[in-house]
Amino acid sequence: MSLVKPLTARQQEVYNFLKHYIETTGMPPTRAEISRELGFRSPNAAEEHLKALARKGAVEILAGTSRGIRLLLDAANDEPEGLPLIGQVAAGEPILAEQHIEGTYRVDPDMFKPQADFLLKVNGQSMKNIGILDGDLLAVHSTKDVRNGQVIVARIEDEVTVKRLERKGDVIYLHAENEEFAPIVVNLREQERFEIEGIAVGIIRNNAWM
């Protein structure tokens, strides 16, 4: 991103601290933390430096939160690579194996919480009652740490399904959100090829989000 004016040495120092702090902790610093680190007399002085950076297009100040700072410098060079779209999945192979990836969509994974790891095209209407429709792209966060009631992506043999999870001991019930579909019942003692691939964190359909 090009700036209206170059940063002063002090502004660059503030920006470098913001960047280092975010990379280290995963979140922006407060004004008090900026003041303490850089030797300002008060958080108000840090606020003035942030406003100067915002005027030059280096940061965006987000209202309503003490850590509401977003870095904008070089944002054009930091575009996300995108999310892989998963197609047919072969039994016994990782869902993100190269041969399963049909393409890549330029979607920022951080738009979803938790972060999305891949997209899955929805086939059928088994989840229509909660707005997951045939043809939607489902954003999925890869994890095996799931809870009852969550909408998950599961694999049974070479079939991938999106359902709401209910687990009772060694028996898993995968519930549809459509009265026309019966639950899928999986007995973990009998079914060897059952994998939980992740949880649904959003959908892409004409800019609508789940």
UniProtKB/Swiss-Prot annotation:
Reactions mediated catalytically: Hydrolysis of Ala-|-Gly bond in repressor LexA
Class of enzymatic activity (EC top level): hydrolase
Keyword Repressor: yes
Biological process terms in GO annotation: DNA repair; DNA replication; negative regulation of DNA-templated transcription; proteolysis; SOS response
Keyword tags: Autocatalytic cleavage, DNA damage, DNA repair, DNA replication, DNA-binding, Hydrolase, Repressor, SOS response, Transcription, Transcription regulation
Active site: S126, K163
One Pfam entry name: LexA_DNA_bind
GO molecular-function term, one example from the UniProt record: serine-type endopeptidase activity
Range of residues in the leader sequence: none
EC number: 3.4.21.88
Residue ranges: DNA binding: 31-51
Site (Cleavage): A91, G92
CDD domains: S24_LexA-like
Assembly description: Homodimer.
Protein role: Represses a number of genes involved in the response to DNA damage (SOS response), including recA and lexA. In the presence of single-stranded DNA, RecA interacts with LexA causing an autocatalytic cleavage which disrupts the DNA-binding part of LexA, leading to derepression of the SOS regulon and eventually DNA repair.
Family label: Belongs to the peptidase S24 family.
Protein name, entry field: LexA repressor
Source species: Actinobacillus succinogenes (strain ATCC 55618 / DSM 22257 / CCUG 43843 / 130Z)
Gene transcribed to yield this protein: lexA
